[in-house]
Curated annotation (Swiss-Prot):
Main location: cytoplasm
Species lineage: Bacteria, Pseudomonadati, Pseudomonadota, Gammaproteobacteria, Lysobacterales
Cellular component aspect of the GO annotation: cytoplasm
Protein name, per record: NAD kinase
Active site positions, chain numbering: D45 (proton acceptor)
UniProt entry tagged with the keyword Hydrolase: no
Record key words, sorted: ATP-binding, Cytoplasm, Kinase, NAD, NADP, Nucleotide-binding, Transferase
Cofactor(s) annotated in UniProt: a divalent metal cation
Name of the coding gene: nadK
Reaction it catalyzes: NAD(+) + ATP = ADP + NADP(+) + H(+)
One Pfam family per UniProt: NAD_kinase
Function: Involved in the regulation of the intracellular balance of NAD and NADP, and is a key enzyme in the biosynthesis of NADP. Catalyzes specifically the phosphorylation on 2'-hydroxyl of the adenosine moiety of NAD to yield NADP.
GO terms for MF: ATP binding; metal ion binding; NAD binding; NAD+ kinase activity
Organism encoding this protein: Xanthomonas euvesicatoria pv. vesicatoria (strain 85-10) (Xanthomonas campestris pv. vesicatoria)
UniProt: NAD(+) binding residues: D45, G46, N117, E118, D147, A155, T158, A159, Y160, N161, Y162, S163, A182
Amino acid sequence: MTAPPRIAFLASPAEPAVAARARLTQRYGDHALDSADIVCALGGDGFMLQTLHRHGAADKPVFGMKLGSVGFLMNQYRDNEDDLLERLQRAEPAYLRPLEMQVQTESGASAGSLAYNEVSLLRQTRQAAHLSVDLNGQTRIAELIGDGVMVATPAGSTAYNYSAHGPILPLGSHTLALTPIAPYRPRRWRGAILKADTEVRFRVLDPYKRPVSVTADSHEIRDVVEVTIRESTQRQVTLLFDPEHNLEERIFSEQFAV
């Protein structure tokens, strides 16, 4: 008989998530992350992203259950906790590769971060950002004027990217969305769909008069002068979903939401 998986339960600080964790650990035990087979994250999408950033390198599959305001990356939490092992056994995997971001700032400092949803550049003041856009070393837009621009993964394409009128990308399509944010010029440019291995470089054309910040998921860096983004070839995380609500179907269904 196969032993049940060892589960590490992680919860957001929200009271419903903390209470759910207490009930689940009483039922299934409380395993440390380094000895667990599966991570169960209790919260919303924000907590799921936090979990991936903090523990993605542990290479443990993550099964999220929604106890927050947004749960696109989560499964539904059910009051009947007795079926969790069956759900884990039936769960379907989704494999996500984050974006790697490298940044140069006005002060000459360098910084880096990962993003599972998107990397977005935004103006810091009332003045529009002026940016150049290079793809694989070739300048494609010499001057983009607007509030900013972003690069989104398929998993993140239904979030901020979609709100900015960017395309929804199928999971496993090996593509990225390049989406302007409130563009003024070029007026007719609405972004592009890129191959996942494309290197994207943004340069801030007037960083002193028109300062720009960059955010990788929730990690913000201000006063940037150059940002380079590429899909990670080293890091991959596995999310687990109930078969009837798998991530691929959710992304597909979003294209028909009214």
